[in-house]
From Swiss-Prot:
PROSITE patterns: EF_HAND_1 (PS00018), EF_HAND_2 (PS50222), S100_CABP (PS00303). Pfam families: EF-hand_1, S_100. It comes from Equus caballus. Keywords: Acetylation, Calcium, Metal-binding, Phosphoprotein, Repeat, Vitamin D. This is Protein S100-G. The gene is S100G. SMART domains: EFh, S_100. One of its GO terms (cellular component) is apical plasma membrane. Ca(2+) 1 binds at residues 26, 31. Ca(2+) 2 binds at residues 58, 60, 62, 64, 69. GO terms for molecular function: calcium ion binding; calcium-dependent protein binding; transition metal ion binding; vitamin D binding. CDD domains: S-100 (cd00213). The modification Phosphoserine is found at residue 47. The modification N-acetylserine is found at residue 2.
Length: 79
């Protein structure tokens, strides 16, 4: 996934993975892992683990990542 996608395209990618289990508007840790493995594999080559990344993105501590929280990752990797 290129981060140069439109907001609508990013939302569709997010929703595709969020719909796999539980709340279709939130990514679980497993859904985030699948999204990164399939769409952003270069992130896994860095020093960040999925657990660390998930903790960083889950700003409200509810155990899931909302689209707004996911956008933090998109902004981070597009810089």
């Amino acid at each position: 996934m290129s981060v140069k996608k439109s907001p609508e395209e990013l939302k569709k990618i997010f929703e595709k993975y969020a719909a796999k289990e539980g709340d279709p508007d939130q990514l679980s840790k497993e859904e985030l892992k699948l999204l990164i493995q399939n769409e952003l594999p270069a992130l896994l080559k860095g020093s960040s683990s999925i657990d660390d990344l998930f903790k960083e993105l889950d700003k409200n501590g509810d155990g899931e990542v909302s689209f707004e929280e996911f956008q933090v990752l998109v902004k981070k990797i597009s810089q």
